[in-house]
Amino acid sequence: MSIPTTPDVKITPLMPKRIPKNKLFVSPESSWTPDSDGKWQLHPFAFDRWDVEEMAYHDTCSLHIGLNPFNVFKVHGSDYLKMLTCATVNTFHNFPVGKARHVIFCDDGGKILLDGILVRTGEEDFLGFNLVDPNFLNMQMGNPFQIECKNLREEYFVFQLCGKRSLEIVEQVCRKDLHDLKFMYSTQAEIDGKEVLILRTGMSGTLAYEIHGNAADAPEIYQKLLDIGAEYGIQESGRLCYVNQHCVGSIFQLAEHFNIRFAPLDDEFILSGSLPRDSELQFHSPYDCGWGNLVKFDHDFPGKAALLAESQRHHNTAVHLIWNKEDILKVQAAVMDPDKRVDYMDMVGDYDFKNNCSTIHMDAVYDGDKLIGASSDRMLSAKTREMISICTIDEDYAVEGTEVEVLWGNPGTYQMRLRATVTLMPYIKENRNNNFDVESIPHPVFDK
């Protein structure tokens, strides 16, 4: 039976040339129809077995392209930093050209509304990734700031490469020695005469780089990465691997690990897991995520009073949990008991195919009858073969080796308490991107 297709339509470089007329579910949260106008990207849930994809960002190099099309704003004007200072927890002292910075927007209660990355590409030029629309933000403030802004969503691509061979691949593709590029810094380069930006950052915690450029150049550059990367063991990675990277990399991600309190999106995300639906633990402050060092109180910003009070009192912090293997097997056995309604536990990780997959799985963490934290993004590490999760927890329990219990199962099901052990962040403690010695990697030699 042939599948009816539409004529060629305006698509991103990552979509096929001809699109089946019926609705598609490729990456589960990314359903696409010809009239969805690029709202969702087409991207596989997986290219290979989950463990093959995940081991690549430890042993060789994983290549992820599922962020495209991405919310990218090109901004001109020194007032942009003044505007962000008024709107975020950050200050922008010591922010030279080429530097990237993690930027956090909070509500009046000190809970995170949005976070993303800002790259300074010139004295008055910036690229904002997953940040509030600068024109909208300026308008909300009464348009006091002089800036020029363009949304590059349809014109920009981002490729993410993670793993100890990532530097070698990027250098060979660009034909440029990038050993001097520091963590969270960017530089300009070319790939076959096409201008790109290289940023040393990544989600997996391992050595990682991003390649940014014009969307029209994306297919050719992608193929070149695969061709050159084959020698170094490059592995395409799908959505599941990318989500799990954040847990292994000890990086909280909005809508994966915590919810936001924002009226227009009240129906956008739904909770699954054992955490009570009215629990404040579903909303995270920077301190809940271990990002308290980014909060600067030398300026006014939304949420300042709440965060200042939080910083001065007993509060939560971020850890990992290692789940007890015997208790995990008890859940697997209970699933097959017809007298119990136990939620199935996917060994690879929690991924809920509901509400177009805008579901956040969060489990309650207890010490006896005391609710002490919220666990999310449970996954089986392909490298350590430990079941781990990322967790915000009462700081009294943020001690290596502390034993806690995670409640497994949605309300209304047969719930089980599973033992877990606290381990401090980061989960990957050796050869992290921020301190990886790139001089242990040979400098490139290029064929003439």
Regions from the language model: what does each represent?
Residues 59-125, 129-146:
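Extended, compositionally biased flexible segments
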Residues 2-57, 120-448:
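Conserved, structured C-terminal
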